[in-house]
Amino acid sequence: PDAYIEHFAYDKECFLDDFPREAKMQDVCKTLNSVGFSSPPSWLKPYAVLSNGEKMRCDLARAILSEKELFVFDEFTSVVDRNVAKIGSLAMQKAIRQSDNKKQFIAVTCHFDVIEWLQPDFIFNTNDMTFSLSSKKKDQTSLYQYTKYQQHKTSGNIGKCLANIII
């Protein structure tokens, strides 16, 4: 439940002031750039005046900079146009992969167009209740984790066998 990110509180004049205090400015800049928010003049604005795409990227960067190892974004790309959704998904995928397996990201979305950009390790489709390996991630680690999932799915103890990016 505490991994679920519904929204962050932003009440400062510059949204950067709401980022984790322990985060170094170099890491903040690197993370904002890694999620595709590469406009330093916009970094000085209040969160409320950002575009939906900038808000999405800001929230993603803040989640990455948080101490949480697992975070879940519901309606991951629903408030942005589809091109921004794809670009944001690619940027997020790269940022998570660069975390050296320190972060896990679960994207909850009804939009299938982001799958090839997000390149999740696993996909759970609620339309037909199927759980599958992403076609691009069929490496040994993912196969091992998927096998563990198959063995433990009836026990309800599957949280530890998942990988970095799940959709």
Q: What does each of the following model-derived ranges do?
A:
Residues 72-84:
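Walker B catalytic motif
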Residues 68-70, 98-106:
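Loop/turn-to-beta-strand initiation segments
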Residues 1-36, 116-117:
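ABC ATPase nucleotide-binding domain signature region
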Residues 31-40, 52-73:
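GG-anchored amphipathic helix commonly corresponding to the ABC/SMC/Rad50 NBD signature/C-loop
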Residues 42-48:
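Interfacial catalytic loop of ABC nucleotide-binding domains
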Residues 138-167:
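Non-catalytic substrate-recognition and accessory regions of acyl/acetyltransferase enzymes
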Residues 102-104, 111-146:
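C-terminal lobe/lid and adjacent interdomain/linker elements of RecA-like ASCE P-loop ATPase modules
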Residues 82-101:
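Helical segment within the ABC ATPase nucleotide-binding domain
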